[in-house]
Regions:
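Mature extracytoplasmic or organellar-lumen-exposed domains after removal of signal/transit peptides
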Residues: 43-444
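Bacterial signal peptide processing site
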Residues: 22-26
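Bacterial N-terminal signal peptides that target proteins for export
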Residues: 1-10
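Intrinsically disordered, low-complexity segments enriched in small/polar and acidic residues
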Residues: 30-33, 37-39
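Bacterial Sec-type N-terminal signal peptides, specifically the leucine/valine-rich hydrophobic h-region
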Residues: 16-19
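Flavin (primarily FAD) cofactor-binding/catalytic cores of flavoenzymes
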Residues: 13
């Protein structure tokens, strides 16, 4: 069913701002019916889109994808080096260095996610790298009262502690921890909470469970969990070290594969097929990626779900308490695409033909509105970052008794919803109608 464009509903922001936490039962908040309003007409689309200019924008989009995935791969290589150092000599210093490398690796990766929606090669590949939330008992030891997905037979499988795991009537040999084995265990028994690979599996192995709930503090895994021989805590330190090494190597390999998909001048890769399509199709993918990440994924899955359920289990980087940064750089990725700009990890800035230049040529007002909304979203995300830097992380903001903190999250969600409305208007201005960004079944 086609969804009414967001910009046509005058009550949009009021509905978003009225979001409220729902307590521990995780029931969705009741949504007030939006009053019927007169739809505002979209700006007249150009009779013919300048194909050459549009194709240049699509080409630069591919250049940006290659650059950002390359930076994600480069920071993953540094993470790999840090984890190798931790395994070689487990100390508080090498564990801290590995954590810092993981945090640095999240910065470019989160800016890649805007390419996920509209580009099947990214969406089909992404789950092995960034699936969440995960039932960490699949991987390693957990507290006996840890919360996990109901009915998940793998929730306490503990691959690290066992040579085989029992799932229903099936026994799975996990004696040799390899990348192929771990990849095969993702969504084990049909449960999306069974995540054996990617950034969040590595995050859990570095930080351990965050047992603080909505109180201050992240996970506190002791470095002794990685000691070989005498002094090992948590048991099975050799297998924990192997798991961490294998998961990291797989992450690096997966990112290298995606860099290749966006390499220029390679016959048969995804970039070649994208550039062979019409420029209009390319622009649609760009706008759809921006709108879907903005609305269904970031505002919905990553923020609204956690807020409404007051659920620390549903925050994105839950073991490290890095959620504020992941949200900020998701939003930054959306802005990158519209402006055609990306600040690389080496400090250089990649610029080129942009959607903004195309929209400005048709409707300076719509272009200005979207730029304003992008700036507003970034400012609201910066509030979350500043809060975490001041000692109040995302999981504390969504606590049931923290009305002031919840309001900060609601304001960011409202900004994302308004931003998505402007994205739809900008697309329509270029003749791209019925964009219908993915809502992930959320109502705003």
């Amino acid at each position: 069913m086609l969804r009414t464009p967001l910009w046509a509903t005058a009550s949009l922001l009021a509905a978003a701002i009225s979001l409220a936490g729902c307590g521990e039962d995780k029931a969705p908040a009741e949504q007030a019916a939006a009053p019927q309003t007169q739809s505002e007409p979209a700006a007249s689309a150009p009779d013919t889109l300048n194909s050459e200019a549009a194709q240049a924008v699509v080409k630069h989009y591919a250049d940006m994808a290659h650059a950002i995935f390359s930076d994600a791969h480069g920071t993953a290589l540094k993470l790999q080096e840090a984890i190798d150092a931790l395994i070689a000599e487990p100390t508080d210093a090498t564990l801290q260095a590995a954590k810092e490398a993981w945090l640095a690796a999240r910065v470019p990766y989160m800016q890649t996610e805007v390419f996920r929606f509209g580009n099947p090669v990214v969406d089909d590949w992404e789950g092995q790298l960034n699936a969440w939330p995960l039932d960490e008992g699949l991987i390693d030891y957990v507290e006996g009262d840890y919360q996990h997905a109901l009915g998940n037979p793998g929730a306490t499988a503990n691959i690290i502690a066992n040579q085989e795991v029992q799932i229903g009537e099936d026994k799975i040999d996990v004696s040799q921890i390899t990348g192929e084995l771990l990849a095969s265990l993702n969504e084990l028994a049909g449960s999306e909470a069974n995540v054996a690979t990617g950034y969040h599996a590595i995050e859990f192995l570095l930080w351990g469970q965050d047992l603080n709930g909505t109180n201050p503090g992240a996970g506190q895994r002791p470095v002794s969990d990685f000691i070989d021989g005498e002094g090992c805590t948590g048991g099975n330190c050799d297998r924990r070290r192997t798991y961490l090494k294998v998961a990291t190597d797989l992450l690096v390999s997966d990112l290298e594969e995606m860099v290749g998909q966006w390499e220029a001048g390679v016959a048969g890769n995804y970039r070649a097929s994208l550039e062979a399509e019409s420029a209009e199709n390319g622009l649609r993918k760009m706008f759809f990626g921006m709108g879907s990440l903005s609305l269904g994924e970031l505002a919905g899955e990553r923020m609204k779900v956690a807020l409404e359920a007051n659920s620390t289990e549903d925050e994105h980087d839950c073991f490290s308490d890095n959620t504020h940064n992941s949200h900020f750089f998701n939003a930054k990725g959306i802005r990158n695409i519209y402006l055609g700009e990306y600040l690389r990890t080496d400090g250089s800035t990649l610029t080129g033909p942009s959607l903004a230049s195309l929209v400005e040529g048709v409707s300076p007002e719509i272009d200005s509105d979207l730029k304003t909304n992008l700036e507003t979203t970034e400012a609201k995300m910066q509030v979350l970052v500043a809060s975490a830097n001041d000692g109040e992380a995302f999981d504390q903001l969504i606590a049931p008794d923290n009305s002031e903190g919840q309001e900060k999250v609601r304001a960011a969600i409202a900004a994302l919803v308004a931003q998505t409305a402007s994205i739809e208007q900008a697309a329509a201005a270029l003749g791209i109608k019925d964009l219908n960004p993915d809502t992930a079944d959320h109502e705003f």
